[in-house]
């Protein structure tokens, strides 16, 4: 198993007696999209700034590809691309000129600069407006330009702070698709957001923050089972022959099978059994029309977690 690309061990940031980040621990694997999620003021941005060497660490440690961001900030900067909440481009310069300027600062060789910039702008869908001034860009276009800068840099990890903040739903969907494409090109990604449900589809794992601490961490499915209980819900729609309910019920890991209406079957399972359910439909002589896996929402998980925590506190106080 390869070493994690990011490690945080008992990472803490204090301002006087107040803890902005309070002893958090997490790893990010190579090729993973890892979400730092939670409400504003929970410690997500402070965590990002410590990972990048842009804020002092009070105690604990962080490593980015084995480098200490406090002692080796330039090594981290060479490997990591950063998209802050507010992207700082020059409004009176074109997208191309902005990237040429940052490419020079990064030390990218002149002979490859032009091709890298053109390729990066094409990948984020800005080729047609490459010569337009950035002052005419929408927030979504500015975010795309920020991703283009990360692509141009050939970063091995992208750290994105609230990338969908202020975007309409369609612009958010398009930006998240671009983030997925970074992963497809071998880039590891850390992103923060307070918009839990908007980004849950893109994250492999998430850490849910509250008051500077990580209160939950894992895949959405793992968190759902831990907090909400129950298992996976697999929905099957099929033109079936007799005996399909029996075949589905007999699958290992199936807890129950319901038929809310003819041709629809809802399975509660211990794990994702979509492949096995599809095979059962075929074996029963049926025709599979649709197969879906229902995932709990992060908003639901987060809300339930704190409802339960508050109830526990009330019981102990009574």
PLM features: residue spans?
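ABC-family P-loop ATPase nucleotide-binding domain
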Residues: 1-12, 308-318
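ABC transporter nucleotide-binding domain
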Residues: 176-268
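ABC transporter nucleotide-binding domains
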Residues: 3-8, 13-211, 215-216
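Short loop or secondary-structure boundary microenvironments that flank
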Residues: 66, 73, 238, 271, ...
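A generic structural signal for secondary-structure junctions
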Residues: 81, 98, 107, 146, ...
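C-terminal coupling/interaction segments
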Residues: 269-318
């Amino acid at each position: 198993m390869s070493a994690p690309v990011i490690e945080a061990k008992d990472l803490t940031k204090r301002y006087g007696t107040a803890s902005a980040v309070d002893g958090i621990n997490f790893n990010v694997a190579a090729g993973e999209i890892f979400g730092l999620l939670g409400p504003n003021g929970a410690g997500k941005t402070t965590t990002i700034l410590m990972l990048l060497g842009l804020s002092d660490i009070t105690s604990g440690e962080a490593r980015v590809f084995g480098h200490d961001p406090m002692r080796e900030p330039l090594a981290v900067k060479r490997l990591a691309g950063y998209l802050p909440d507010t992207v700082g481009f020059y409004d009176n310069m074109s997208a191309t000129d902005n990237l040429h300027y940052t490419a020079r600062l990064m030390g990218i060789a002149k002979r490859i600069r032009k091709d890298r910039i053109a390729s990066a702008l094409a990948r984020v869908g800005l080729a047609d407006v490459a010569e337009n001034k950035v002052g005419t860009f929408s927030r979504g276009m500015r975010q795309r330009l920020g991703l283009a800068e990360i692509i141009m840099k050939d970063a091995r990890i992208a750290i994105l702070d609230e990338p969908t903040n202020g975007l309409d739903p369609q612009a958010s969907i398009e930006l998240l698709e671009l983030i997925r494409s970074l992963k497809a090109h071998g880039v590891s990604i850390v992103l923060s957001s307070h918009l839990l449900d908007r980004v849950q589809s893109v994250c492999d794992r998430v850490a849910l923050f509250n008051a500077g601490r990580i209160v939950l961490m894992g895949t959405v499915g793992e968190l759902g089972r831990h907090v909400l209980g129950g298992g996976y819900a697999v929905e099957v729609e099929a033109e079936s022959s007799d005996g399909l309910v029996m075949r589905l019920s007999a699958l290992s890991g199936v807890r129950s099978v319901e038929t809310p209406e003819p041709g629809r079957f809802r399975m509660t399972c211990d794990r994702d059994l979509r492949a096995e359910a599809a095979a059962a439909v075929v074996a029963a002589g049926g025709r599979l029309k649709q197969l879906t896996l229902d995932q709990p929402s992060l908003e639901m998980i987060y809300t339930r977690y704190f409802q339960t925590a508050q109830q526990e506190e009330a019981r102990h106080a009574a």
